Amino acid sequence: MRPCMDGKRLNLHLVSDATGDTLNAVARAASVQFEGSDIHLHRWSLIRSRLQLHRVLEGIEAERGPVLCSLLDQALRHELDEACQRLGLRILHVLDPVFDLLAEELGTPTRPTPGRQYVLDADYFRRIDAMHFVLSHDDGQALRGLAEADVILVGVSRSSKTPTSFYLANRGIKAANVPMVPGIELPGVLDDPPCPVVGLFIDAEPLIEIRRHRLTLLGQGGGAAGAFRPDSGDYVDEEAVKAELLWARRTCSARGWPTVNVTRRSIEETAAAVLKLMDAWHERRRRTATSA
């Protein structure tokens, strides 16, 4: 029996004994691949007792649809499996293939503990520290602290430097970002950077649209739009923007800094590209040190 659907609407139930963030990420990553379909996510988190599970089953029966599950308690899993079979609904235990693979490779069984990934550990505090670092080193602030950065992002105004920095901070990476402005010298620390420097670029047309939107939000009057005055025609003038981008690219090329074009990239994709370039930088340093 197939799940109940109204037209292209599908109810998808996410049942977890922790926050449910993992299931939610998996479900959203998969659902965006089905354009035009209305997939409605029902999140059931922190399910750790039979009473809680019974409430979940009531919800599933009321709005029937397949189930993605990450429960670790075997008794609760068994009861949910039986209920889905009775209702004619499909269920997928999302983490099981990963557990099976790791158990086989490591030669050791899992020790199921709900929410273990959320225990406050060194990684958690590393992410918090990185977030504080980004806040204090955004848009060229606190230049003296750049030596402590894991990566320095450079680019023209509105090239996604700040959101990419915060995404990296959530991975525990101290990312500073420095604006590139024609006529203004870059900080001296970038002459001999202690960490990878990556230039972020965007095509001229979308950059102009982003900047125009920024000016609209600022009301054309108060505040600053990146490193430019919002009433400056150069900020959104096509020829000026193209010249600005060309200068920035040549600067990065002359200094040997790799670049990432963020046009049509999500922040996650941009961050992944930056991480790959960071790995390459460290690998070159390692090889140089080994051969010295």
Curated annotation (Swiss-Prot):
Class of enzymatic activity (EC top level): transferase
MF terms in GO: ADP binding; ATP binding; phosphotransferase activity, phosphate group as acceptor; protein serine/threonine kinase activity
Reactions the enzyme catalyzes: N(tele)-phospho-L-histidyl/L-threonyl-[pyruvate, phosphate dikinase] + ADP = N(tele)-phospho-L-histidyl/O-phospho-L-threonyl-[pyruvate, phosphate dikinase] + AMP + H(+); N(tele)-phospho-L-histidyl/O-phospho-L-threonyl-[pyruvate, phosphate dikinase] + phosphate + H(+) = N(tele)-phospho-L-histidyl/L-threonyl-[pyruvate, phosphate dikinase] + diphosphate
Keyword Lipid metabolism: no
Residues that, per the record, bind ADP: 155-162
InterPro entries, per database record: Kinase-pyrophosphorylase (IPR005177), PPDK_reg (IPR026565)
Coiled-coil ranges from the UniProt annotation: none
Pfam annotation, one family: Kinase-PPPase
UniProt keyword list: Kinase, Nucleotide-binding, Serine/threonine-protein kinase, Transferase
EC number(s) from the headed UniProt entry: 2.7.11.32, 2.7.4.27
Family note: Belongs to the pyruvate, phosphate/water dikinase regulatory protein family. PDRP subfamily.
Summary of the function given for this chain in its UniProt record: Bifunctional serine/threonine kinase and phosphorylase involved in the regulation of the pyruvate, phosphate dikinase (PPDK) by catalyzing its phosphorylation/dephosphorylation.
Protein name: Putative pyruvate, phosphate dikinase regulatory protein
Source organism phylogeny: Bacteria, Pseudomonadati, Pseudomonadota, Alphaproteobacteria, Acetobacterales
